[in-house]
Curated annotation (Swiss-Prot):
Cofactor(s) for this UniProt protein: Mg(2+)
Enzyme Commission number, as recorded: 1.1.1.86
Gene of this entry: ilvC
Name the record gives this protein: Ketol-acid reductoisomerase (NADP(+))
GO MF terms, alphabetically ordered: ketol-acid reductoisomerase activity; magnesium ion binding
The species this protein was found in: Klebsiella pneumoniae subsp. pneumoniae (strain ATCC 700721 / MGH 78578)
Length: 491
């Protein structure tokens, strides 16, 4: 099979990369009704599989789970989760032939095997759903022409999909129809109903393409979302300890610092995150972020280039075929780092202390978010898609580090994200080695001393922060989410 994106001509590639439209709330007036009375069979019962299924059932849909025979016979975790939540469970042969919509929510590396197993069993005119388009775009999976292929991609981990639904809301979601597989022209109706059934329409839905979702998703997770957090954690910890900081304190400052810093990011973007600093610290964080952007720009561009060309995917799929040798080696090495093995700090660190003593971390977040966004947009991805795949998801990933350090992050994210994370972080750490030797007192681990600030310089820095394109689109999208949340609660 050929990489689907690489079979397109340049005009088609640009059109699909640039497909992105924020959908109006009234486009979802029919809710999930298009799928009511139809049989929806989910393949896979991991975090996305279970939680999307719970939401869809609560929205009135007929949901069951198709699992492999051995998973049922051995009563594996997927079987236990589905049965304990009261779902009907059966083999592919028992459930797929009756399905109107088959939703493939297994890990990326299993998609080809799953699709090849279920496709011959699917009835004529059925639909096949994904929550990530890797199998279609990068693997180039060929789907029967009578089958409609759609995607509903919540921009959050599966647990968040469920928790937001229970609160009467949802999570921002991308939907798409594969242009090669929409024989009856009903793909968008199916995708909209599925998104509504998960609650996504209450938080904002972008009509996108399989191509735009995959290329932007891969870029975000490799760079700012996972790779930058991992590289930053290792670099900052080693720097603090080398300067004489207690390893336990250093570990806590970093482990919980990302979450604290990005909570401000979630509420008010880079502007609010920077506003949490004193004026001297803000000026220093800005200067550091500009240095970091200049150093790291070629690395971000290389990752985007390799994603666009398919080089990244072919390398990762070669590792799949080699029993994940690289992935497992990198995972083991990460687990042995000084940051991961440091003792826990029993003392308390106040919220503002994370900002005051984490100026470098804030600079890394700012530089990474802006670089990821700028690099995606320069490659033809629309700003709204680039925002969701950079700034929006960062607090969610930072939260996983707060739970159990880098181990937890790498367990929670997909194997695809984990592989890309290691590629980036293994390149980024040595790239920033010299930069780390230029840090000043107050950049990390101690607060910057109060001092005189040049008004004109502060004015210009504030303007530069607020006028960045990601701040403009972020303010708009966060406003949509806030407005929709008010409507959802009122309703």
């Amino acid at each position: 099979m050929a990489n689907y994106f690489n079979t397109l001509n340049l005009r088609q590639q640009l059109a699909q990369l640039g497909k992105c439209r924020f959908m109006a709330r009234d486009e979802f007036a029919d809710g999930a009704s298009y799928l009511q009375g139809k049989k929806v069979v989910i393949v896979g019962c991991g975090a996305q599989g279970l939680n999307q299924g719970l939401n869809m059932r609560d929205s009135g849909l007929d949901i069951s789970y198709a699992l492999r025979k051995e998973a049922i016979a051995e009563k594996r975790a997927s079987w236990r989760k589905a049965t304990e939540n009261g779902f009907k469970v059966g083999t592919y042969e028992e459930l797929i032939p009756q399905a109107d919509l088959v939703v493939n929510l297994t890990p990326d590396k299993q998609h080809s095997d799953v699709v090849r197993s279920v496709q011959p069993l699917m009835k004529d005119g059925a639909a096949l759903g994904y929550s990530h388009g890797f199998n279609i775009v990068e693997v180039g999976e060929q789907i029967r022409k009578d089958i409609t292929v759609v995607m509903v991609a919540p921009k959050c981990p599966g647990t968040e999909v469920r928790e937001e639904y229970k609160r009467g809301f949802g999570v921002p979601t991308l939907i798409a129809v594969h242009p090669e597989n929409d024989p009856k022209g009903e793909g968008m109706a199916i995708a909209k109903a599925w998104a509504a059934a998960t609650g996504g329409h209450r938080a904002g839905v972008l009509e996108s393409s399989f191509v735009a979702e995959v290329k932007s998703d891969l870029m975000g997770e490799q760079t700012i979302l996972c790779g930058m957090l991992q590289a930053g954690s290792l670099l900052c910890f080693d720097k603090l300890v080398a300067e004489g900081t207690d390893p336990a304190y250093a570990e806590k400052l970093i482990q919980f610092g990302w979450e604290t810093i990005t909570e401000a990011l979630k509420q008010g973007g880079i502007t609010l995150m920077m506003d949490r600093l004193s004026n001297p610290a803000k000026l220093r964080a800005y200067a550091l972020s500009e240095q970091l952007k200049e150093i790291m720009a070629p690395l971000f561009q290389k990752h985007m280039d390799d994603i666009i060309s398919g080089e990244f995917s072919s390398g990762m799929m070669a590792d799949w075929a080699n029993d994940d040798k690289k992935l497992l080696t990198w995972r083991e090495e990460t687990g042995k780092t000084a940051f991961e093995t440091a003792p826990q700090y029993e003392g308390k660190i106040g919220e503002q202390e994370y900002f005051d003593k984490g100026v470098l971390m804030i600079a890394m977040v700012k530089a990474g978010v802006e670089l990821a966004f700028e690099t995606m947009v320069a490659s033809g991805i629309i700003e709204e898609s680039a925002y969701y795949e950079s700034l929006h998801e960062l607090p969610l990933i930072a939260n996983t580090i707060a739970r159990k350090r880098l181990y937890e992050m790498n367990v929670v994210i997909s194997d695809t994200a984990e592989y890309g994370n290691y590629l980036f972080s293994y390149a980024c750490v040595p790239l920033l080695k010299e930069f780390m030797t230029t840090l000043q007192t107050g950049d990390l681990g101690t607060a910057i001393a109060e001092g005189a600030v040049d008004n004109a310089q502060l004015r210009d820095v504030n303007e530069a922060i607020r006028s960045h394109a990601i701040e403009q689109v972020g303010k708009k999208l966060r406003g949509y989410m806030t407005d929709m949340k008010r409507i959802a609660v009122a309703g």
